[in-house]
From Swiss-Prot:
One of the primary rRNA binding proteins, it binds directly to 16S rRNA where it nucleates assembly of the body of the 30S subunit. One of its GO terms (cellular component) is small ribosomal subunit. Part of the 30S ribosomal subunit. Contacts protein S5. The interaction surface between S4 and S5 is involved in control of translational fidelity. Belongs to the universal ribosomal protein uS4 family. It comes from Methanothrix thermoacetophila (strain DSM 6194 / JCM 14653 / NBRC 101360 / PT). Keywords: Ribonucleoprotein, Ribosomal protein, RNA-binding, rRNA-binding. This is Small ribosomal subunit protein uS4.
Length: 183
């Protein structure tokens, strides 16, 4: 069973490690989303795999006519909707049609870049790890943090960060233009 205080691996490696198509796809996703290594991609795939497995099990239990299946399905769909992975009013089939990009788009690193707080996806990662970004008033230093739909608009520079000042040279030009400062 293992020691409960020890962290355990949260991902699975691919079964065929040298498959050319998969490797090319992984490299493209790593570049697009600014991931540090393939392990981060595999963690996101594990999250996706978990929700797909739950979706398949719930569809099977609904087909058998189990009473709790509807309640559990609503809970899973509600959770994925809160994170913005699914749209409101989605059904169990939508869980099975999720893609890895749906998970990667909800990462804090991607959200910081998409909102224009950083010039590049790599700079977004650096801002987060150096503690320059806050979500809902709390400093977050984990680029893989999954941002909830309600917290999207609360992503900003941390108040104690030098980047919070208007004239900082590393601030994105999009933000300077949006706040009314000079570019």
């Amino acid at each position: 069973m293992g020691y409960p205080g020890k962290s355990h691996k949260t991902y699975d490696r691919p079964r065929k490690p040298w498959e050319a198509d998969r490797m090319a796809n992984e490299v493209e996703l790593i570049k697009t989303y600014g991931l540090r290594n393939k392990r981060e991609l595999w963690k996101a795939e594990s999250i996706l795999r978990k929700y797909r497995r739950v979706g398949r099990m719930l569809l099977a239990s609904k087909a058998r006519g189990e009473a709790r299946a509807d309640i559990e399905a609503a809970a899973v769909i509600n959770r994925l909707s809160r994170f913005g992975i699914l749209k409101d009013g989605a059904d169990l089939d939508a869980i099975l049609s999720l893609k890895i990009t749906d998970i990667l788009e909800r990462r804090l690193q991607t959200q910081v870049y998409r909102q224009g707080l950083a010039n590049t996806i790599r700079q977004a990662r650096q801002f987060i790890t150096h503690g320059h970004i806050q979500v809902a008033g709390q400093r977050v230093t984990v680029p893989s943090y999954l941002v909830k739909r309600g917290d999207e608009m609360t992503i900003d520079y941390y108040a104690g960060s030098p980047l919070a000042r208007e004239g900082h040279p590393e601030r994105s030009s999009k933000i300077v233009a949006r706040t009314g400062g000079s570019a």
